[in-house]
């Protein structure tokens, strides 16, 4: 039996709903409601719209996993060329949005692609958008230990993983890799580490979250490198249509 949504501790008022947007589908989470839909399923779209309109929801936050972001240091950012930042990362430059990190160091430019707020008829709710990378970056900025060298952070999802690298606590690298199994995960991980001239014996891989479904990945990595984990209530496993995503929950990293 697959894992179900694991409810984290929350400090957010119950009037807020979260919608996780992926490439081919999205997922609503609000109180006891947990439902996924494609962007073309009219029956599900109507069902989700009714849930949001007929409930006490007064704000909806969209968390975007649906396209690769472009990450630009604030001092080099030019708001006038947002579309150009995305041209090398993604084929979609529709509904471009941007975040700025909590530490005011980087701008995150991304395509929202589908404007679900209009599709779902959310004209009375307060709407906000954030890219998944921005949440991840803000989270790590709050928990990273002081280090004199490179720090490697990895978050595994079903079918992909993300790697972030810091040098002396300064962010320097992010990428997402699609993978089939733990062997592909190992290949891409050490390909990146070797490009940064990392010493397998000296440096350590830090996994964001520790979940039983990814034990094979952890065990394989531990044969070639030291590993560690960040574990706390800020992480959830979401099971969307048989796929598992490790999500930084906004409830725990925002006021």
Task: Enumerate the predicted regions with their spans.
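Hydrophobic/aromatic-enriched cytosolic interaction surfaces used to assemble or bind macromolecules
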Residues: 1-255
């Amino acid at each position: 039996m697959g894992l179900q949504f694991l409810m984290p501790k929350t400090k957010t008022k119950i009037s807020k709903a979260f919608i996780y947007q992926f490439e081919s589908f999205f997922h609503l989470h609000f109180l006891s409601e947990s439902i996924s839909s494609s962007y073309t399923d009219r029956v599900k779209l109507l069902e989700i719209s009714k849930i949001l309109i007929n409930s006490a929801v007064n704000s909806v936050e969209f968390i975007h996993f649906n396209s690769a972001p472009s990450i630009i240091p604030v001092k080099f950012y030019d708001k006038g060329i947002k579309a150009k930042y995305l041209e090398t990362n993604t084929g979609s430059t529709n509904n471009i949005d941007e975040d700025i990190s909590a530490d005011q160091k980087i701008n995150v430019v991304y395509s929202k692609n589908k404007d679900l707020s209009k599709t779902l008829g959310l004209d009375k709710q307060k709407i906000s958008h954030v890219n998944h990378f921005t949440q991840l970056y803000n989270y790590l900025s709050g928990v990273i230990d002081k280090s004199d060298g490179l720090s490697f952070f990895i978050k595994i999802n079903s079918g992909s993983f993300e790697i972030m690298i810091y040098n002396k606590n300064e962010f320097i690298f992010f990428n997402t890799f699609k993978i089939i199994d733990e062997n592909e995960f190992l290949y891409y991980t050490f390909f990146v580490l070797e490009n940064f001239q990392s010493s397998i014996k000296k440096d350590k891989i830090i996994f964001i979250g520790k979940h039983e479904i990814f034990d094979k990945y952890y065990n394989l990595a531990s044969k070639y490198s030291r590993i560690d984990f960040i574990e706390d209530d800020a992480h959830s496993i979401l099971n969307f249509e048989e796929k598992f995503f490790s999500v930084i929950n906004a409830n725990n990293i925002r006021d």
